[in-house]
Amino acid sequence: PKTDEFFTYGETLWDHVKDLPHGYCHGDMYDGNIHKTPDGKFYVLDFDTSCEGFPMYDLALICNKTHYFGFNESGDGKSKEVLSRFLPGYMKHITLNQTEANAFYDLIALYHFALQATIIEMYGPHCVDNAFLDEQLDWLYKWWAQCAKETRT
């Protein structure tokens, strides 16, 4: 695999997000971990990755509509659409600065990057091969290129 490229990508990504405000972070706040009861109450599950982190990371994961195994150009637009619907209610309770808002796309990339490490940690290095890792790096490059207009113009 293109290990050096993964390392460089990860370091660059980290440089973009490392100075974001820190606070409580669930760490796995995708819609599968949010359940609505018949009486309309919401419950958040799966706290094994909660930590001191970037609260904006949870917001990015809630709004993330990309597909891990294959890049789909509509993932950007769908994620942005969910963010635009979710953000007004969120902002009634939590203030975001512009740096946090601009980190949205980088945090989705960070989640994608982290999922690879989680899969290998859980199932061992034999569960992926070089072609799979190269495809994941390609996904990250495509995502970065597509989102560059939004955050780095």
Language-model features and meaning:
Residues 1-27, 37-39:
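An alpha-helical support segment within catalytic cores of ATP-dependent transferases
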